[in-house]
Amino acid sequence: MNRKLFSVGAALFLLLLFQFCVHAADLPVTSAFGWRVHPISGEWKFHTGVDLGYAEGTPIPALFDGIVIQSGNYTDGFGNQVLLYHPAYDTYTRYAHMSDVYVSVNQYIMQGIVIGLVGATGYVTGAHLHLEYIVRGANGDYVYANPLILWQ
């Protein structure tokens, strides 16, 4: 079976499932957005996204159309990651700890396209998807928002 075709099909299924059928409470959240004790360092730190407990190799679809701003390993603890800018909403999404990245900087990505695979790269305790949602704050600066609002 063609791996890319399977990945695109699986990712589109996950995207439809996520946005239309799954409630935030049903997502496999292994670490919530907000303040927490970091599982490796033991420090009290702000967690800028949510960790979703998907198996290594699970396809990751882009949640919205967007432009790839970062793609690869930036040695910032996220391991392999993709940062997408979504001009229609003036927001960003980051997908981190990926085992494989399928997109390149400046590439335009359509909603549902597989951008990579869930992995365990960077500063992690195991395979998962770290998902961030970055929006304009009240003062015009970009701020982290709880990604689970996308499912409410």
Predicted regions and their residues:
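Sec-dependent N-terminal signal peptides
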Residues: F6-L15
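Short peripheral tails and domain-boundary helices/loops at the edges of structured domains
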Residues: I134-Q152
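Positively charged n-region of N-terminal signal peptides that target proteins for export
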Residues: M1-L5
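Surface-exposed, glycine-biased beta-strand/turn segments
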Residues: L14, F18-N80, Y89, Q111, ...
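Short histidine-centered loop motifs in beta-beta connectors
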Residues: A55, P61-A62, S71, A88-V114, ...
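Histidine-centered divalent metal-coordination motifs
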Residues: H47, H97, H128-I134
